[in-house]
Amino acid sequence: YDDVYVIGDATNIMLPPKTGALAHYEALHVVRSIINQVHGYGKTQFDGSAMCAVYGSGSDGFFIYMNYYKSKAYGPSPIFRSAKKTFQGLYWLSLKGVVDPFLEFSKRFFSGGP
């Protein structure tokens, strides 16, 4: 359907994994697409790009990059475990409005550019 946007488990994307990180990047893409439509720019296509840090065993973690064509895991490393802890903190702050994850996109689009 035109003008219908879906994120997360409800999408028709069949590739695993359906992660919270992927839903986050889908949401950012939906915001960008709606703003493009409001300003008369063309639709954009989401390529499935997402990244996330995950906990591993002990003091290690992994960093994962994925898109529709490939996935790559980096690690194990204590640095990636620290990144996961940091990302969690930023996520909860964004829900409280302390950190605005859409600010970059908003500034770009409201300044008149795609």
Give the label of every model feature segment.
Residues 10-56, 63-65:
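A conserved FAD-binding loop/helix module that cradles the flavin
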Residues 63-114:
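C-terminal auxiliary extensions adjacent to catalytic cores
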Residues 1-2:
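Rossmann-fold NAD(P)-binding glycine/threonine-rich loop
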